């Protein structure tokens, strides 16, 4: 829902699909049966997916912070609060990148709509030329990938620590068992409740960034199709030349004779 969105973009404070310029351009493309309609709609759908996923991640981290208030272990609580703060910073960074992307989309739509008023449907042919979204989309994709990899590395470190901790515990227990003449324990216990708590924020971040990356790649694919379609369309100058070439033979034909003797 729109009320849940806490971030804004440089062109609007509303979700991208509800922006007036975006809605107007989508309606215009559909009304004129433009081949660009489907790909532009997919691009907007992918950006909406990014908005929604960031909104979910913000809610998840807020819920985790509430749970931490009930935690009794002060050292663990402080560590998890620090983790949440770091991940909130990562999300804020992605919100900023998304904000810049949305601003460019809105600005591009505004230019296309203005150009349409001057040149008509020809303005709809070069959609990708007005949008200039590739650098902004790549920034979102790369940022999401970097944060996702950082979360993976953090979880691997946690698993390694927990494994070493339980392995050390197993050796200590086996020493006691040996002294009592009992069989040693062969396997260490798996990570327990603490490991689950510590990894939870990283899991949420990894899921969020994975979805962000996937949506950015979908948007880039849609943009690439728009660019390819624009390359294959004849330019205005080429269209004028083709039209002139069709009219040229008619100009060169001799005018019909009006001589009485020729009838």
What residue spans do the PLM features occupy?
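Gram-negative host-targeted secretion-system effectors, predominantly Type III and Type IV
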Residues: 1-261
């Amino acid at each position: 829902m729109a009320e849940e969105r806490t971030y804004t973009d440089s062109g609007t404070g509303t979700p991208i699909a509800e922006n007036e310029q975006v809605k107007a351009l989508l309606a215009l493309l559909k009304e004129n049966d433009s081949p660009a309609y489907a790909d532009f709609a997919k691009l907007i759908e992918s950006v909406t997916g990014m908005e929604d996923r960031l909104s979910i991640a913000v809610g998840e981290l807020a819920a985790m912070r509430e749970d931490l208030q009930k935690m009794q272990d002060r050292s663990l609580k402080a560590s998890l609060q620090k983790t949440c703060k770091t991940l909130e910073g990562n999300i804020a960074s992605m919100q900023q990148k998304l904000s810049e992307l949305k601003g460019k989309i809105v600005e591009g739509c505004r230019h296309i709509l203005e150009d349409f008023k001057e040149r008509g449907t020809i303005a709809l042919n070069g959609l990708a030329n007005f949008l200039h979204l590739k650098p902004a989309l790549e920034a979102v994709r790369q940022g999401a990938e970097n944060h996702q990899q950082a979360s993976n590395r953090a979880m691997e470190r946690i698993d390694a620590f927990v494994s070493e901790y339980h392995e050390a515990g197993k050796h200590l227990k086996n020493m006691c068992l040996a002294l009592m003449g009992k069989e040693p324990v062969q396997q260490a216990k798996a990570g327990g409740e603490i490991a689950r708590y510590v990894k939870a924020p990283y899991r949420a971040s990894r899921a969020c960034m994975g979805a962000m990356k996937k949506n950015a790649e979908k948007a880039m694919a849609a943009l690439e199709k728009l660019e390819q379609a624009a390359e294959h369309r004849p330019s205005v100058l080429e269209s004028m030349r083709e039209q002139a070439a069709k009219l040229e033979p008619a100009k060169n034909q001799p005018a019909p004779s009006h001589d009485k003797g020729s009838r």
